[in-house]
């Protein structure tokens, strides 16, 4: 079933969200104590006794094993979030990437202003765009820097070194050649943590149970918005939360 996403401009966005297997997993939650199985889940009418059972099982202590039916309730959605949220999300084993935007492939073509969240400083954006411009026009800048050097030598009445080449200077004092390879290293290394990337994710209610439990009071506000959205998914408030959240 399709469910609503959410959008907090410049912070986090969820779209194209769907939930699968809700009814089927509710039915299957009875199997451990059943003497038969449901031959046609489409025809089965979920009753109050089924909801009572899953409310009890779903709110079991995390890790007890009694809430395993939650694994059958699948959730897929597009998530746009900054780099620091993605790195924290990666610690969860049962939320996975279907496909995602690639910084390695597209950093030179992204609209950097649009891709950075509102907390990234103007200085950081200007610096990143500078190195991207260098990369995209490396030959022109090599000639420009060479000309500037020669003109400076003439102005200062210094001998021009015919082998002089512009170097990239690192903060540790090291110098690197002004090449596309080295410029790309600088671009990737100086991409801010507030860089927003979108990925299609797949997970399940059991994993969401852990995320909600661990991230609802996180110091990063993005997690508050994400977990609030998770809490609003169908039946999450009835079969995932309550007892263990108190």
What is the predicted function of each stretch?
Residues 1-246:
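Family-specific signature for flavin-dependent thymidylate synthase
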């Amino acid at each position: 079933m399709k469910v609503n996403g959410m959008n907090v401009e410049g912070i986090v966005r969820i779209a194209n969200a769907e939930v699968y297997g809700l009814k089927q997993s509710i039915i299957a939650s009875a199997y451990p104590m059943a003497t038969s199985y449901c031959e046609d889940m489409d025809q089965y009418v979920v009753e109050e006794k089924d909801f009572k059972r899953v409310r009890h099982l779903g709110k079991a202590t995390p890790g007890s094993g009694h809430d395993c039916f939650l694994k059958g309730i699948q959730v897929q959605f597009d998530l746009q979030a900054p780099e620091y949220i993605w790195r924290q999300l990666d610690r969860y084993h049962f939320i996975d990437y279907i496909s995602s935007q690639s910084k390695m492939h597209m950093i030179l073509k992204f609209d950097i202003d649009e891709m950075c969240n509102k907390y990234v400083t103007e200085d950081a954006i200007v610096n990143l765009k500078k190195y991207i411009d260098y990369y995209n026009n490396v030959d022109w800048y090599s000639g420009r820097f060479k000309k500037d050097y020669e003109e400076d030598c003439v102005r200062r009445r210094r001998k021009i070194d015919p082998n002089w080449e512009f170097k990239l200077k690192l903060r540790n004092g090291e110098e690197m050649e002004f090449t596309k390879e080295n410029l790309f290293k600088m671009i990737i290394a100086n991409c801010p943590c507030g860089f927003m990337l979108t990925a299609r994710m797949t997970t399940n209610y059991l994993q969401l149970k852990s995320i909600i439990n661990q991230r609802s009071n996180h110091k990063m506000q993005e997690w508050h918005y994400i977990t609030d959205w998770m809490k609003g998914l169908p039946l999450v408030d009835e079969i995932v939360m309550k007892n263990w959240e108190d």
